Amino acid sequence: EDHFAQVFAALGKLAVAEQWPVNWPARCENISFGYVRGMSTRKGEAVWLEAVLDEARDRAGRFRVQRAETSARGPASLAAGEADAVSEAVGQAALLYFDVSSRRMTDLSFDWDAVLQFEGNTGPYLQYAHARMSGIFRKAAEVGLDMADEPGDLAALGADEEWLLVQKLRGYSVAVRRAAEQREPFEIAHYLYELASVFNAFYNRHVVLDVAEPVRSRARLSLVKATQQVLRSGLQLLGIRALEQM
């Protein structure tokens, strides 16, 4: 930190001497972070980022195939090029989210199997929640419950899980502001994990699409839409791609 303080001070003096129109060095701040263990070779050599990203893509692709083989729903219908793009996005999400899933001064132990899981506090878990919401909207269009012309009336909501989700959505701006003030992207990551968990609890407990109850179904679709918008926004802030299918 002393090194960067000296660098910023020197740049500040240069800005004054050269009469820069904006003294941007005065606004510079060094953001410290912890150490990541498990990201070196067996010989103790550093690992290049490109190699890590390639490994993440390949592992994510294999993990997707293995998971699809054991899933009752089977694999998503993706073309070869789309499957490769999804694997790359999932691999990147796994790495990016791992880095922000703890407070930045925390020392981390890297584990490939842990960061690629589709359950728990991981990037792929958040992407899967987003993809699940997109699947709900595709199914809604198929059964004639598209929200385009008739948005839902939230007054039709009443279940505890529904209002827990509404309450969680209200906390997004607080999490973003806290992340900016504290220089802690963890605040956004932690919020998104809680949001996805609350959404999954709602989804597992209630039927979103019921043609026999169109009013309630459209209300729940509106709730899912709001949740997806917040989740997508948060993922974008973390640099993670929100996926429509996985």
What is the predicted function of each stretch?
Residues 1-246:
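Non-catalytic interaction-recognition regions
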